Amino acid sequence: VYNTVAFIGKNASGKTSFLDLLDCAYSILGNFSLEDKNYSYDGIHLVLFFYHDGKIYRYSTDIASSQNLSNKATFSHQELSEKTYYKSKAKAIFSDDDFTPVENIGILPEDTSIVFFVLKKKETRAVYFNSDGEGANTYRLMFHALKLYKLSPSVLSKVLHLFDGNIKSLTMLEDEHNYELSLTTGKKTVSDKELLHILSSGTTKGLLLYVTVIASLKYGFDLIIDEIENHFHKTLVENIINLYKDKSINKCNATLYFSTHYCELLD
């Protein structure tokens, strides 16, 4: 299994579309649903192969936009089959031979995938960052990520210092839209929109993404980044790639997927 996977190509070559598809697959396997995505659900026929508890599963479905549920997808013509995984037959994983239908598939709402009956528990399997960023919402998402992944306050301090040595601390206030910003020149309370103009765009994007990198390495979920150079300086990109390649750091075998225009990153 590769711990870093790069997608490189000229503009309009399909890099973002591929990462969108990857995010789609991870969302189905992690949440059993598709919701609030930036891409259209209509006209998609999807076939997924995944491994779980000694078996290879083949899942196929048609996807469409829900007529009743806002920003959700519906699943139809779903089929789920399985076969025992043998290392000696690794080259035949994607062969249709030996697959048998999964038994005891119940009825679920149309917006829920039947892979639920195999995986059963929702969990973060991957986090996707598109090339646009989250704007003023970035800071709230960052603090929620710190809480969700149980990362210590010292993590934020180190990440802040990594991107801007003038920032001593950043604290989210109870309304989740105002922040106490401590700089080397003093403290002040600012809104998320004001903070967006105070900090550089690279710092804003980098804060949330780097916190997620740390969580990914800690828990082993994968990270998908579209146009990684839009988030980080080239040197920092190289450092992140090395973190995922270093087995002493990436002990849970997380994988970094990214698209880039940096040809030299492939050296």
Features from the language model and the residues they span:
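Switch/communication elements of ASCE P-loop NTPase nucleotide-binding domains
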Residues: 1-33, 187-267
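Conserved P-loop NTP-binding catalytic core
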Residues: 2-6, 19-67
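Short, glycine/acidic-rich beta->alpha junctions
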Residues: 40-42, 152, 205, 236
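A structural signal for short, well-ordered beta-strand segments and their strand-loop junctions
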Residues: 47-49, 59-60, 128, 168-173, ...
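Electropositive, glycine-dotted interaction segments
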Residues: 63-176
